[in-house]
Amino acid sequence: MAKNTQRTMPVLPLRDVVVFPYMVMPLFVGRAKSINALEEAMNDDKQILLVSQREADLEEPTPEDLFDVGTIANIIQLLKLPDDTVKVLVEGQNRAKINSLEDGEKCFSAQITPIETTYGDEKELVVAKSAVLSEFENYLTLNKKVPTDILNALQRIDDVDRLADTMAAHLPVSIRHKQNALELANVQERLEYLLGMMESEADILQVEKRIRGRVKKQMEKSQRNYYLNEQIKAIRKEMDGGENEDTIDEVEQLHQKVEAAGMPADVRDKVENELQKLKMMSAMSSEATVIRSYIEWMIQVPWHQRSKVKKDIVKAQQVLDTDHYGLDRVKERILEYLAVQARLNKVKGPILCLVGPPGVGKTSLGQSIANATGRKYVRMALGGVRDEAEIRGHRKTYIGALPGKLIQKMAKVGVKNPLFLLDEIDKMASDMRGDPASALLEVLDPEQNTTFNDHYLEVDYDLSDVMFVATSNSMNIPGPLLDRMEVIRLSGYTEDEKLNIAMRHLLAKQIERNGLKKGELTVEESAILDIIRYYTREAGVRGLEREISKICRKAVKNLLVNPKLKSITVNSDNLHDYLGVKRFEFGKADTQNRIGEVTGLAWTEVGGDLLTIETASVVGKGKLSFTGSLGDVMKESIQAAMTVVRARADKLGINAEFHEKRDIHIHVPDGATPKDGPSAGIAMCTALISCLTGNPVRADVAMTGEISLRGKVLPIGGLKEKLLAAHRGGIKTVLIPKENVKDLEEIPENVKQNLAIHAVETIDEVLGFALENPPEGIEFVKVEAKPKAPRRKVTSKSERAVN
């Protein structure tokens, strides 16, 4: 093939390197198009066009970003590496002019014309060769970066074309200068260009040497740390009027960013020292990479940037009310907190910790607080975190070291005063790598977090402007950490609250997400109420939202399958067509008064429920047994109730010997569900008295309260959930401990209006409300045992013989 024949071949763009003919060079290739170009070349004639990029930092270059002249190279060896990159060994052959360059889907391809080398006058070539070698030798004495053995290798090259290309390849000059040498097909012109370039570089090196000496003499010992900066200034002063560089070097760029970052004086001194180290290092050294990464992190961390905080409490209340239905006490406490912060213009104060079951809006409440105050929002999930370095970071001496997640999040959000949500703070763990909860102590203590020290940064960072809010599902938080936070409890939503949330927010949200138009789907309140009661059992509304989403999906399918159907209405009658059979049944009050059967009230993580307690008495020897997956505390409560009954047996008219002649069995149905706690004490005691007196218990009465050995009714927890369960189950009268009257303020008005709530102090008051009649004892009939026939003595043969 003639050298001037046009041909098409794949193109490999190069960054920071120019490959000359006669050069053998390894290349590391990682870009997909470049790898495709190599594969195409390997499948053809193993030749590829190597072209340098005009800008080395371009990841995806266009045809305009490549030079017009490249080098045709043979692929000697190609090796695929484990990280999906490719190492290829190439040998330059000859120059080529790009006539047209196409950016294909797989790779670049170019239509090229090989460039024929010309030599010029032979005598002038000899003179130029001698001058170039002489100047190169002089250049080596000034620039110690070029190995001296290259001169010996160049002197052994007879071919002037190869000599010029080899010398150009080894000169430490810019890519632009090397590309200019590559584009010169005439050898004489190329040698003259190299000669001029080396003379210019030698002049600069001479000036640099002279300046360095002069600056060194002028500096005192106290100024030695600034030696390199003075050197650069002197060089620029000497070069005034010359050709300016197109770009500022990397160190100077970092220096400008450090100045703009607004760091405190001590932090800036630390970073300046690191910059000085970086200037004296080779850019390719591993330590330079570590220092560069450290400085970039220090620049990214916000030192003075702040977002403007809103102080309009009325507007904040509107935002909270719009985003969350109910939660009045929680929102009131948050507004109090924001009001104090607005008045003091500081964030210092208690760290809020929102504690409640899943799905009640803890995380979204944190987002709403950020919206209400105008702060940027950043969230850090602590679930499963067990390494202290996740909070404090790794020391930068470790390979791959990074700041802790706290500093990383601050760098990402870009301001000093965001709302920082520590999500699932109770899910942290600890192991041999440290205890992240202990690391958080410094973060959450207002007296200490002004000087938070990340192991990677190695300087103090002020976190006092950050508004921290934590969330947790339980109080299972280390004591010292809990002591630094103010707990705000979010109980489960009431039935009315769930209904309102579904009708106002969830339904519209799911209709939009599932592509339904306005009017195509109507879900009545009765259907939502049935979903809450029979298809979900939760404290929050996540399950409720999933069920509504299921209805929307089925509605979309039905509308597409039946084009004549224009709209769908879902109510309690046809709900099972969309959600299937009912999954749950909530407790309902019995309609008949029964002996030994009492309705108690239970608290669960998903709300309250009715708890039926059954008692039976049979002839026996005074054995007390209990079944129904009862916990230790509940078993002890039964024993306490039995002692109360025995102590009051005479007063209640119960045969004092019942505990010797009767077996008592207490059973709590739904035996597969574990039950525990002391709050069923008065219910257990009432059931025992009803059983032993034959006096029925009113079916419309439910009760909750712990019993003491002296018959006093002690306070309990979860009153709100228990009263909601009683209201839902059709109970008319509820007995609660007198000490829990203060908790009635939290109960919705509609619930209190529909329940007759009586506060009781003793078991006597409980019996007055719960029993159908005043308690009277039962005379247990003594069962006479039939006389047994005398046992006949059996004698052995030997005994008979004796007698």
From Swiss-Prot:
Domain Lon proteolytic: 592-773
GO BP field: cellular response to heat; protein quality control for misfolded or incompletely synthesized proteins
Binding positions (ATP): G356, P357, P358, G359, V360, G361, K362, T363
Induction data: By heat shock.
Compartments reported by the entry: Cytoplasm
Gene3D superfamilies in UniProt: 1.10.8.60, 1.20.5.5270, 1.20.58.1480, 3.30.230.10, LON domain-like (2.30.130.40), P-loop containing nucleotide triphosphate hydrolases (3.40.50.300)
EC number per UniProt: 3.4.21.53
MF terms (GO), sorted A to Z: ATP binding; ATP hydrolysis activity; ATP-dependent peptidase activity; sequence-specific DNA binding; serine-type endopeptidase activity
Chemical reaction(s) catalysed: Hydrolysis of proteins in presence of ATP
Residue ranges annotated for the Lon N-terminal domain, each copy included: 9-202
The protein's name in its UniProt record: Lon protease
Function of the protein: ATP-dependent serine protease that mediates the selective degradation of mutant and abnormal proteins as well as certain short-lived regulatory proteins. Required for cellular homeostasis and for survival from DNA damage and developmental changes induced by stress. Degrades polypeptides processively to yield small peptide fragments that are 5 to 10 amino acids long. Binds to DNA in a double-stranded, site-specific manner.
